[in-house]
């Protein structure tokens, strides 16, 4: 099942409870345990400025878009073996769609 636009408000709520402890989204936001996600769409894996990535993330070589994030967020450690992202993933496609819809807006403002 591919990405389909979701509910931005539900995505914001999911991000706040499941992602924000490790990631920021605003321009110039700090890297935390995970990298700042501003500008993530169109960026290659392992390229957020000032963040120390694993070799696996740097070498994956894919560009983040709706489809790659949809696959990654289902099971990050399966998609990029060796990633240090501890989050197990969003198993429900609707949750992934909602978070990605939120990220598309929040990481580009």
Curated annotation (Swiss-Prot):
GO CC, alphabetical: mitochondrial intermembrane space; respiratory chain complex
Instruction: Give all N6,N6,N6-trimethyllysine modified positions.
Output: 77
Instruction: State the source organism's domain of life.
Output: Eukaryota
The primary location reported for this protein is mitochondrion
According to the UniProt entry, its GO molecular function terms are:
electron transfer activity; heme binding; metal ion binding
Q: Does the keyword Heme apply?
A: yes
Covalent S-S links between cysteines: none
Its annotated compartments are: Mitochondrion intermembrane space
UniProtKB keywords: Electron transport, Heme, Iron, Metal-binding, Methylation, Mitochondrion, Respiratory chain, Transport
List of residues binding heme c: 19, 22-23, 85
Q: Which GO terms describe its biological process?
A: mitochondrial ATP synthesis coupled electron transport; mitochondrial electron transport, cytochrome c to oxygen; mitochondrial electron transport, ubiquinol to cytochrome c
Q: How is it modified after translation?
A: Binds 1 heme c group covalently per subunit.
* Similarity remark: Belongs to the cytochrome c family.
Relate the protein's function as given in its record.
Electron carrier protein. The oxidized form of the cytochrome c heme group can accept an electron from the heme group of the cytochrome c1 subunit of cytochrome reductase. Cytochrome c then transfers this electron to the cytochrome oxidase complex, the final protein carrier in the mitochondrial electron-transport chain.
PANTHER family in the cross-refs: CYTOCHROME C
Q: What is this protein called?
A: Cytochrome c
Q: What organism does this protein naturally occur in? A: Schizosaccharomyces pombe (strain 972 / ATCC 24843) (Fission yeast)
Identify the gene encoding this protein.
cyc1
């Amino acid at each position: 099942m591919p990405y389909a636009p979701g509910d931005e408000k539900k995505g914001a709520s999911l991000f706040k409870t499941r992602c924000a402890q490790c990631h920021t989204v605003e321009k110039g936001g700090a890297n935390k345990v995970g990298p700042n996600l501003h500008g993530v769409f169109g960026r290659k894996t392992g390229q957020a400025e000032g963040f120390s990535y694993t070799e696996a993330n740097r070498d994956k070589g894919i560009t983040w878009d709706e489809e790659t994030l949809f696959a990654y967020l289902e099971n990050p450690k399966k998609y990029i073996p060796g990633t240090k992202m501890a989050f197990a993933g969003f198993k429900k496609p609707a949750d992934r769609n909602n978070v990605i819809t939120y990220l598309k807006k929040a990481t580009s403002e």
